[in-house]
A protein has these predicted regions:
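N-terminal leader/targeting and accessory segments in enzymes
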Residues: 1-109, 263, 295-297, 322, ...
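Glycine-rich, charged/polar anion/phosphate-binding loops
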Residues: 30-32, 203-206, 291-292
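Fold-independent oxyanion-binding glycine-rich loops
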Residues: 35, 48-50, 79-80, 96-99, ...
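Short, conserved beta-strand segments within well-ordered enzyme catalytic domains
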Residues: 44-47, 77, 197, 257, ...
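Structural motif corresponding to alpha-helix initiation and N-cap regions
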Residues: 59-63, 178, 182, 290
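Acidic, Mg2+-coordinating active-site environments of NTP-dependent enzymes
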Residues: 82-87, 217-339
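Active-site regions of enzymes building and remodeling cell-envelope glycoconjugates
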Residues: 87-98, 165-172, 276-280, 292
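Phosphate-binding loop of NTP-binding sites
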Residues: 102-260, 264-277
Length: 339
C-alpha cells in the first residue's frame, strides 16, 4: 500500500491539483486502475471520459461503473463531474477534469514507490508510415551493441532475444492505454531492459497515453492523409504529432530526429527548437541534412547506401550500409534508425 502524500515529492503537480487531492492524500491504496472491472480491494479507480468525440456522457452508465467499485475502491479520481451521483456512493470521489495531464506520472510514480527500478531510455517514433519498421530497426541496432532492448508497437510488445529478434506479445493498440503502457514499461524495467523503442501514434499522443513516459529521443518519419475520421484536419493531425517534440509534455527529451523531406518537418523542427532539443535531420534529397543518402545502389538483394554525415553528428564524414531492405521508403527508415 502507498499514499499520495508519499508520492508528492516525486511529482510536479500544480498547487490547485494538490489542494483537490487533500481529502485523500493520506488514504492508503494499492494501484491506479482505469477499468472498473479490474479494480481490486483498496485500489484507486480512475474514471475517464470516452475519447470518442461523438460520445456524450451517460450518467446512468457512469453510475454503473461506480457501483462496480463502491465496495472495493479506496477512492475515485474522476475526469467526469459526478456531483449529481455523489450521494449514492459512500466513497470519496475527487473531480479532476485535467487528470490526463498527470495520470501517467501518477501511475509511474506509484509503481516506482512500491517497487523501485531503473527505467529504460525511451526512443519514441511517430509518423503516418514507418513507425513499426523504424522502431524495430532501432531496437535491433541498440540490441546489437549489447544493450538489453525492448520494442512496443503495432507488431507487438516484447524484449529482444540474444540474436536481436523480439519475442512479441500481440498488442491491442499501436500505443497502449496509459495504465497498460506504464505497467508494461515497469515489467521491462524489472527484466533489466535498458532501452525501449516505442511507436507513438497520433491517437496515443492526443489522448496523452504516453504522459509520464521518460522519452529521451523522438523520431518523426512522415505525415500523410490518414486518421481524419479522428482528427479534424491535417493541421490537427500534425499538431498531435508535434506534441512528441515538446518538453512541456516530455521533460526528459534530449534529441529529435526529423525527416527533412516531409512537408511537416518544419513544424516538428520548430517544436523541437522551442524545447531546446538537439535536432538531427535526415533526407534522401537534401544534402544539408545531418544524415543524407548520398548514394543508393539498389539490387534484388536490397542495396548499398552511403550516408553523408554532418559535422554536428560526427567528424567521420560518411557511413556505408548494406541492407536487405527494398525500396526508397526503407532507405528513409534506415536513415531514421541510424540517426
Amino acid at each position: 500500500m502507498i499514499t499520495l502524500q508519499a508520492m508528492m515529492s516525486a511529482l510536479s503537480l500544480p498547487e490547485s491539483v494538490r489542494q483537490l487531492l487533500n481529502p485523500v492524500m493520506n488514504q492508503p491504496f494499492g494501484q491506479f486502475v482505469v477499468d472498473s472491472r479490474q479494480v481490486g480491494q483498496g485500489d484507486v479507480f480512475v474514471l475517464l471520459k470516452s475519447q470518442n468525440v461523438t460520445d456524450s456522457i451517460d450518467l446512468e452508465k457512469v453510475a454503473g461503473y461506480l457501483a462496480q467499485v463502491a465496495d472495493k475502491a479506496a477512492f475515485v479520481l474522476s475526469e467526469i463531474d459526478v456531483s449529481a451521483l455523489q450521494s449514492q456512493f459512500m466513497l470519496p470521489i475527487i473531480y479532476l477534469p485535467s487528470i490526463r495531464d498527470f495520470l501517467g506520472s501518477l501511475i509511474q510514480t506509484s509503481l516506482q514507490q512500491q517497487h523501485p527500478t531503473k527505467l529504460p531510455a525511451v526512443i519514441a517514433v511517430t509518423g503516418t508510415n514507418g513507425k513499426t519498421t523504424v522502431s524495430q530497426l532501432v531496437a535491433q541496432l541498440i540490441s546489437q551493441s549489447g544493450i538489453k532492448t525492448a520494442v512496443m508497437g503495432t507488431a507487438g510488445n516484447g524484449v529482444l532475444g540474444e540474436k536481436g529478434q523480439p519475442n512479441l506479445i500481440p498488442s491491442t493498440h499501436t500505443t497502449l492505454e496509459v495504465f497498460n503502457l506504464h505497467h508494461a514499461i515497469d515489467d521491462f524495467a524489472k527484466q533489466g531492459v535498458q532501452a525501449l523503442a516505442i511507436e507513438a501514434s497520433s491517437h496515443g499522443l492526443h489522448q496523452q497515453r504516453l504522459q509520464g513516459v521518460p522519452v529521451n529521443v523522438a523520431i518523426f518519419t512522415n505525415l500523410s492523409r490518414d486518421h481524419l475520421d479522428y482528427h479534424t484536419d491535417m493541421d490537427d493531425y500534425a499538431q498531435a504529432k508535434a506534441r512528441l517534440f515538446d518538453k512541456a509534455h516530455f521533460p526528459t527529451l534530449t534529441h529529435a530526429i526529423i525527416n527533412l523531406d516531409d512537408e511537416f518537418s518544419e513544424l516538428m523542427i520548430e517544436a523541437a527548437n522551442a524545447s531546446h532539443l538537439t535536432v538531427w535531420t535526415y533526407s534522401l534529397t537534401n544534402d544539408q541534412a545531418d544524415f543524407f543518402a548520398k548514394t543508393i545502389l539498389p539490387s534484388l538483394q536490397g542495396g548499398d547506401l552511403t550516408i553523408a554525415l554532418s559535422k554536428a553528428v560526427t567528424p567521420q564524414g560518411k557511413l556505408t550500409v548494406n541492407s536487405p531492405l527494398l525500396g526508397r521508403f526503407n532507405v528513409a527508415n534506415l536513415l531514421a534508425s541510424i540517426a
